[in-house]
């Protein structure tokens, strides 16, 4: 998306005029998927190289330095460590908006990164970092974007000065 934006906006400054820049959106998604697969396998290789043990399952604390992991097959394993880091990633928040769960056109950020067709228009609910990243990327591809934010300014979780800088670069 950034490359398309650069070609459209900055090319003229350096004497490059390009007519009819076209985005092949299915190819963009295929490229994104290939990179994602490469990164995932790279992480697996790093874990193996560094002799990191990976255990699939759900953890529960059973002591100050002890957890019990229930594996997908139902078996359990207890582990002890001097430090336990909870780094489980994030889950998309689904706000209490009437009809949101029943609407097939309502997608989360993961779904937005997996669309097969570039939409002509898009409403992004939430003016936080992820919402604005998606809004800017899709706008660069040519989608008409509207961002809905409940707070009185975009990027409400950031410091006011950072918010001004971020919004100025949109």
Model-flagged regions — what are they?
Residues 135-140, 146:
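Gly/Ala-rich phosphate-binding loop of Rossmann-like dinucleotide-binding domains
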Residues 122:
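Conserved class I S-adenosyl-L-methionine
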Residues 131-132:
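N-terminal Rossmann-fold NAD(P) dinucleotide-binding loop
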Residues 1-118, 146, 151-155, 160-169:
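Glycine-rich flavin
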Residues 125-128:
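Glycine-rich Rossmann-fold phosphate-binding loop(s) that bind the pyrophosphate
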């Amino acid at each position: 998306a950034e490359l398309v934006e650069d070609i459209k906006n900055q090319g003229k400054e350096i004497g490059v005029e390009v007519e009819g820049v076209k985005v092949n959106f299915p190819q963009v998604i295929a490229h994104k998927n290939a990179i994602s697969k490469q990164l995932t396998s790279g992480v697996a290789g790093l874990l193996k190289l560094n002799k990191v043990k990976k255990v699939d399952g759900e953890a529960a604390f059973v002591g100050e330095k002890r957890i019990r992991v229930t594996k997908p097959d139902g078996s359990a394993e207890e582990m002890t460590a001097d430090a336990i880091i909870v780094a489980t990633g994030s889950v998309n928040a689904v706000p209490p908006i009437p009809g949101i769960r029943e609407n097939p056109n309502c997608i989360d950020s993961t779904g937005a990164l997996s669309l097969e067709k570039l939409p002509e228009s898009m409403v992004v609910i939430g003016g936080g970092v992820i919402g604005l990243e998606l809004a800017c990327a899709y706008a660069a591809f040519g989608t008409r974007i509207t961002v809905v934010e409940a707070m009185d300014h975009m990027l409400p979780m950031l410091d006011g000065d950072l918010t001004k800088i971020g919004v100025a670069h949109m």
